[in-house]
Amino acid sequence: MRKTRIIASAGLAGAALMGACTNFLNSDKAVQNPNNPTTATTAQLFVGVQANIFGEQEGPVAMIICEWMQQCAGVNGRFVDQQGVYSISAGSFDGSFQSIYTGGGLLQIKQVEKQADAAGDKVTKGMAEVLEAMNMMFGADIWGDLPYSEAAGTNTTPKFDPQMTVYGNLLTLLTNAIADLKGAGGPNPADDLIYGGSTTKWIEAAHTLRARIYLHRVEKLGNGEYTNALAEAQLGISKPADDFKSAHNGATSERNMWAQFQTSSFGNDLVAGSILVDLMTAQGDPRLPDYFGLNPKKTYGGYNVTTQATAVADISPILGSGRTDDDAFSQPIITYDENQLILAEASFKLTGAAAAAPFLNTVRAEYGKAAIATPTLADIMNEKYIALFQNIETWNDYKRTCLPVMHPARSKAVIPGRLFYGQTEEQTNPNTPSSDQQNLFTVRNANDPAACPP
C-alpha cells in the first residue's frame, strides 16, 4: 500500500481502514518474503536437480561401493568396519536415500517437467525426464523396491514399487524423453551444466541409459536383454568428448565431492584397493596417476581387503592423484568408454569374442594398450572395471557377471548386494521393510537373485 494512499485514507472510519490493511497484509506480495521465495523458476529448479544428481553419483554411496568393489580400501575410521565387516545401518545412508525424493530429487524433477510442459518447452522437459530416469535408477539399483508411482503425489506413505516394475517404467520414460528432446524449446545453455543445451548429446546419453537398464535386467530376464542393450548402445554416446559428466569449480561448496573428501581430515581413511592397482599395473595403464597418488616407495600399490595385511609403505593414497588434485574435476557418470564396453559385453554374449573385440579394443587403444584378438568376458569386464573407477555402475557390473574375480572381506561369505533403506523412510513410512528384514548377506534385489561365489 503506497504512502500517498494511506494519507488520503486517513479520514476513513476505523473499520474500513482495518479492512483495507488486512487485505494488504494478506496479499500475495505481502506474505512472500523475497529472501525466502515460495516458488522457483524452471531454470533454478533445473540447476538444482543437476546438482543433486552429481551428489548422488559422487557422494557416500559411491565411496562405499568403491570400497566393496575393492577399487578403494578403508584403512582408518568408520571405513575400516564398513569394508572389513560390511558394518552399516539404516542411518548410514539416510541422506542418500532421501536425495532420491527431495533437495533436487523426484519432487523437484516433477516440478521442472510440469513447468516446462506448461511453457511448451519440450526440450527442458526431456532433459528433466532423463535426469528422473537417472535418479530413480540410482535408487532401484541400490535398494531394489522403492516408492516411485506414488512418491511425488500427496500420499505421505507411498507404496514400494517392485524393482523390475520401476525399471520397465524408466525405459518408457526414456523413450518419452528422447521424443521430447526432439521438440521445441530448451534451457539457457548456461543452465544445462552437462551438455550446454545440446539435444543430440542428451539423446545419446538417454540411449546409453536404456542400455544400462537392459543390462541390469539380464540376470533376471535372460540373455534376450543383451539384444536390447546392444540396440540401444548402438545409438548411445558416440565419442569421448560427449561423456555425461558432473560440473564443478573451485568454490568451496562447488568442488568435486571426492576432492572435498580427500582434502579433509578424513582423506587418508580411504586409499587405493589392490585389485584395481594390480590390474592397471599389469596392463601398464596410463591412468594410474590420475586415479592414485604415489606410495612411500614412489610406486603404486593397493590395500588387500581379503588379507588385511598390506604394509603401509606399499599403499597408494587417493590423495595426490590427478583427480583429487583438481577441485573442478568433472566426474564421469555415463561415458563413451562405458557405452563401447556395453557393446562389447552384449556382442560377446550374443555372438562371441570376434564380435566383441572391436569395441573392447577401441577403448584399449585410447590408452595405448595392445589389442586383444580373442577377448574373454573377463577381459571386457576388467577393462570396464578400470574405466569406471569411482562409478556406482561397477557394483551393478559385478553383481551381474561376478567379474573381476574378488573375494569378500575376511570372515564374510558374500559381498552385499544392496544397502539398507534410509532410517527416516523406515521411521515415517510403514510400507518400508524394517532393518531386521533386510539382512545384507541373504536378501538380494530382484534383478540380482544370486550372490557371486566367495
Feature annotation, model-predicted:
Residues M1-A10:
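Bacterial N-terminal signal peptides that target proteins for export
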Residues A365-G368:
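Alpha-helical protein-protein interaction modules
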Residues P60, I386-R400:
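Bilobed periplasmic-binding protein-like "clamshell/Venus-flytrap" ligand-binding domains
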Residues T376-Q390:
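Cyclophilin-type peptidyl-prolyl cis-trans isomerase
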Residues T39-A43, G74-I342, A346-F359, A373-L377, ...:
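Structured, solvent-exposed acidic/aromatic patches
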Residues T4, A15-L45, V49, A133, ...:
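Bacterial Sec-dependent N-terminal signal peptides
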Residues C21-N76, G236, M406-P454:
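Membrane-proximal, proline-rich intrinsically disordered regions
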